[in-house]
UniProtKB/Swiss-Prot annotation:
Record GO terms (molecular function): metal ion binding; ubiquinol-cytochrome-c reductase activity
Protein origin, superkingdom: Eukaryota
Transmembrane segments: 33-53, 77-98, 113-133, 178-198, 226-246, 288-308, 320-340, 347-367
Record has Transmembrane helix as a keyword: yes
Binding residues for heme b b562: 83, 182
Something else known: Heme 1 (or BL or b562) is low-potential and absorbs at about 562 nm, and heme 2 (or BH or b566) is high-potential and absorbs at about 566 nm.
Keyword field: Electron transport, Heme, Iron, Membrane, Metal-binding, Mitochondrion, Mitochondrion inner membrane, Respiratory chain, Transmembrane, Transmembrane helix, Transport, Ubiquinone
Species of origin: Gazella gazella
Protein name, as recorded: Cytochrome b
GO cellular component terms, semicolon-separated: mitochondrial inner membrane; respiratory chain complex III
Length: 379
C-alpha cells in the first residue's frame, strides 16, 4: 500500500517536518521552545483576530472599545487577557530560545540564526504596536517616547518621525496605522518562521554536546511530538494561571487611564520584556548614543558567529564560558529591574554598570574565555 503521508504533495512537507524528521536522540527540554513559540504565535493570531472583531482603531473610541470587550462581549475578558499575557509568554519563550542558541552554539547555523534575529525584531515591533492600541496613558506616552527616538537620526530624523506619526504628534493617524501593522505583522512572522524551519531542516537540529548527531537519530514522531505536547500543556498551564488569577500582574496601572496628551505619567516605561533594552537606552546621557546602544543590544546577536573563538561548538564542556553565560543572564535580569525604576541614584549608576557589563561580556570576556579554554585543552 502506498503511504499517503509520504507521497501526497502537501502531506509530504508536513511529514518531513514533523513526523519522519530525523532528530538527535539527546536534545533536552531547551529544544522545546521552538514549538512553544509556534503555539504562542497561533494563540496570539487567534485571540487577536477575535479582539479585532470588536476593537475600533480610533482615538475617540479605542479605549472604550477595549472596555466594551471586557464588559459586554461573551468571554471578551478572557480573550483580551489571554492576548495580553500571551505576549508575555511569547517573550519568555523567545528569550529562552535565544539563550539556548547562545549556550549551545546554535548560531553556527547562519541562515537559521539570522532569520531568527529578524523574527525577534519583527516580534518586538509587533508587541510595541500592540501596546499602543488600548490607547491608555502608557500606550500614548510609550508610543510618543519610542517613536521620538528616531528623531535622533541626523538630518532626516524629524521628518521621519512626523512621517511615521502621520502628523505633528501621536494621534488618530498613528493609531490607525499601528493597528494595520499590528494585524499584518504576525502573518509575516508566521511566514518567516516557516523559512526559519526550512533552513533548520537543511542542516538538522543541533544538540547539547554540539557534536554531529548523524550517527544517532530518532524519528520526531512519536518521541518529540509527545515531548512537545508536555511543553505545550505546561505553557498553557502557566498562561491560564496568569490570566485567571492575576491578569494585570505584568501590566501597568497607568494604562487603565485613557490617553491624555496634556498629562504626562511620572514614570514612562514599556512592557517588562523591553525593560532591559530601555535600561541600556537610558544609561547613555546622549540621545543618538542611547538609540545606537538600544539597537546594538539586539543587533549584537548577528555578530555571535563572528565572536565564536572556541574550538568547541557548545558550552557543555566549557566551565569558564558557562560561568560568563550565567553572569550575562543575571546582568539581563538586573537591566530589566533597572528599566522599571525611576531615573535617580543609585539606579542610574547600576544601569550604566550593567549596560557596560552587557557589551563587555559579549564582545570581550566570552571570546577571551573561549581562547583561554582552547589553550587549557592544548588545542
Amino acid at each position: 500500500m502506498i503511504n499517503t503521508r509520504k507521497t501526497h504533495p502537501l502531506m509530504k512537507i508536513v511529514n518531513n517536518a514533523f513526523i519522519d524528521l530525523p532528530a538527535p536522540s539527546n536534545i533536552s527540554s531547551w529544544w522545546n521552545f521552538g514549538s512553544l513559540l509556534g503555539i504562542c504565535l497561533i494563540l496570539q493570531i487567534l485571540t487577536g483576530l477575535f479582539l479585532a472583531m470588536h476593537y475600533t482603531a480610533d482615538t475617540a473610541t479605542a479605549f472604550s472599545s477595549v472596555t466594551h470587550i471586557c464588559r459586554d462581549v461573551n468571554y471578551g475578558w478572557i480573550i483580551r487577557y489571554m492576548h495580553a499575557n500571551g505576549a508575555s509568554m511569547f517573550f519568555i519563550c523567545l528569550f529562552m530560545h535565544v539563550g539556548r542558541g547562545l549556550y549551545y552554539g546554535s548560531y553556527t547555523f547562519l541562515e537559521t540564526w539570522n532569520i531568527g534575529v529578524i523574527l525577534l525584531f519583527a516580534t518586538m515591533a509587533t508587541a510595541f504596536m500592540g501596546y499602543v492600541l488600548p490607547w491608555g496613558q502608557m500606550s500614548f506616552w510609550g508610543a510618543t517616547v519610542i517613536t521620538n527616538l528616531l528623531s535622533a537620526i541626523p538630518y532626516i530624523g524629524t521628518n521621519l518621525v512626523e512621517w511615521i506619526w502621520g502628523g505633528f504628534s501621536v494621534d488618530k493617524a498613528t493609531l490607525t496605522r499601528f493597528f494595520a501593522f499590528h494585524f499584518i505583522l504576525p502573518f509575516i512572522i508566521a511566514a518567516l518562521a516557516m523559512v526559519h524551519l526550512l533552513f533548520l531542516h537543511e542542516t538538522g537540529s543541533n544538540n547539547p554536546t554540539g557534536i554531529s548527531s548523524d550517527a544517532d537519530k530518532i524519528p520526531f514522531h512519536p518521541y518529540y511530538t509527545i515531548k512537545d505536547i508536555l511543553g505545550a500543556l505546561l505553557l498553557i498551564l502557566v498562561l491560564m494561571l496568569l490570566v485567571l488569577f492575576s491578569p494585570d500582574l505584568l501590566g501597568d496601572p497607568d494604562n487603565y487611564t485613557p490617553a491624555n496628551p496634556l498629562n504626562t505619567p511620572p514614570h514612562i516605561k514599556p512592557e517588562w520584556y523591553f525593560l532591559f533594552a530601555y535600561a541600556i537606552l537610558r544609561s547613555i546621557p546622549n540621545k543618538l548614543g542611547g538609540v545606537l546602544a538600544l539597537v546594538l543590544s539586539i543587533l549584537i546577536l548577528i555578530l555571535m558567529p563572528l565572536l565564536h573563538t572556541s574550538k568547541q561548538r557548545s558550552m557543555m564542556f566549557r566551565p569558564i564560558s558557562q560561568c560568563l553565560f550565567w553572569i550575562l543572564a543575571a546582568d539581563l535580569l538586573t537591566l530589566t529591574w533597572i528599566g522599571g525604576q525611576p531615573v535617580e541614584h543609585p539606579y542610574i549608576i547600576i544601569g550604566q554598570l550593567a549596560s557596560i557589563m552587557y557589551f563587555l561580556l559579549i564582545l570581550v570576556l566570552m571570546p577571551a574565555a573561549s581562547t583561554i579554554e582552547n589553550n587549557l585543552l592544548k588545542w
